[in-house]
């Protein structure tokens, strides 16, 4: 083989096993398909066997789809000086008819070909600090989801046993909690309610403690300025701002705002054929966590008048540079006005919120890249 040979190694990775295949441009199909136990050392041995075939001077590039293994395998291979790429699954080329027959060997061959023909987008590899912060925030969100589920279970239990709170319109206020603790039921029912309330108290305390920790993380030098800037936008508090920054990492890797919103799966799909063109719902391709955060943030634009600033927003904006505040005010006014205009034109609230989330993503990209003009 000549010195310019590049060997592409597709890896279909799972918890228990890796299936590997190699491909060189000019060959008809990937070769040397092999299934091995899930161990990066065995991947290195596989590559060493290929070196005896293609030579030491050839370039070797491994790749696998983003999935349950995260970045662990990538870091192992890179530490052993082996080039590795993580492929975004939603961007990979699909061969017609192949999707109906899915095996590990086929997937490994497909990945090898995608690497060779560059028919994919690589996954951004976060810094170690970003990855730790991201995992911490996701852990907190999991516990918040447990808290929400526990609240729903308590309300369902109360309703099944004729306990209906009518003192105020809202649940989980001080009045509601006092009422909940004062209920007297027969036998095991009382024990069930007590256990539910005990679990609720534990989860509430845990979430509050984690929120304080996230607040402290957002004050780190690497994040403080960016978090301060993002919190000038309506609906984005420090935990949300920190989560977006840690999840995305380098905003400069997106050349345009539209690329960033597409990365989050917030752009509408399209079905075009001949003269016909049909707009579809959002693609939902990309980072689901940030997409959910921005859709939740967009809901805040449905509360308050155009141009109105709450006391909390004014406090968050205080101390930021004038150009940042002016940019945020422009975004806030435009998004709030757009929301009410869409409702006036008969659009459903959820459609309007999703449209706002897409545009909010564009404003976030502009702020992180200092596009204040």
Task: Annotate each PLM feature.
Residues 40-60:
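Short, basic/hydrophobic alpha-helical segments
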Residues 141-229:
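Glycine-rich, often acidic, oxyanion-interacting loops/wings at catalytic, nucleic-acid
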Residues 337-373:
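Basic, amphipathic alpha-helical segments enriched in Lys/Arg and hydrophobic/aromatic residues
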Residues 228-232, 238, 243-345:
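Phosphate-backbone recognition surface of nucleic-acid-processing proteins
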């Amino acid at each position: 083989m000549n010195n310019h040979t590049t060997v592409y190694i597709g890896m279909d990775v799972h918890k228990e096993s890796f299936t590997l295949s190699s491909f060189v441009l000019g060959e008809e199909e990937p070769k040397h398909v092999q299934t091995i136990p899930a161990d990066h050392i065995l991947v290195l041995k596989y590559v060493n066997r290929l070196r005896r075939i293609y030579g030491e001077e050839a370039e070797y590039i491994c790749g696998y789809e983003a999935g349950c293994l995260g970045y662990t395998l990538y870091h192992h291979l890179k530490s052993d000086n082996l080039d590795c790429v993580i492929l975004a699954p939603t961007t990979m080329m699909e061969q017609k008819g192949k999707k109906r027959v899915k095996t590990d060997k086929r997937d490994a061959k497909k990945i090898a070909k995608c690497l060779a023909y560059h028919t994919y987008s690589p996954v951004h590899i976060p810094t170690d600090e970003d990855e730790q912060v991201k995992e911490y925030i996701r852990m907190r969100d999991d516990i918040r989801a447990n808290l929400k589920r526990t609240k729903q279970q308590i309300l369902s239990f109360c309703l099944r046993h004729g306990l209906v709170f009518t003192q105020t319109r809202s649940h989980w206020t001080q009045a509601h909690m006092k009422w909940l603790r004062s209920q007297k039921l027969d036998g095991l029912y009382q024990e069930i309610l007590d256990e539910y309330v005990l679990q609720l108290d534990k989860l509430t305390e845990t979430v509050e403690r984690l929120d304080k920790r996230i607040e402290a993380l957002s004050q780190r030098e690497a994040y403080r300025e960016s978090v301060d800037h993002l919190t000038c936008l309506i609906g984005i508090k420090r935990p949300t701002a920190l989560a977006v920054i840690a999840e995305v990492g380098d905003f400069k890797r997106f050349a345009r705002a539209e690329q960033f919103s597409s990365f989050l799966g917030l752009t509408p799909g399209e079905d075009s054929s001949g003269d016909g063109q049909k707009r579809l719902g959002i693609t939902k391709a990309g980072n689901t966590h940030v997409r959910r955060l921005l859709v939740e943030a967009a809901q805040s634009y449905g509360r308050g008048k155009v141009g109105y600033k709450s006391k909390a927003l004014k406090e968050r904006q205080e101390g930021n540079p004038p150009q940042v505040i002016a940019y945020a005010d422009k975004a806030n006014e435009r998004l709030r006005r757009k929301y009410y205009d869409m409702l006036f034109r008969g659009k459903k609230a959820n459609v309007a919120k999703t449209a706002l989330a897409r545009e909010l993503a564009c404003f976030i990209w502009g702020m992180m890249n200092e596009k204040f003009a």
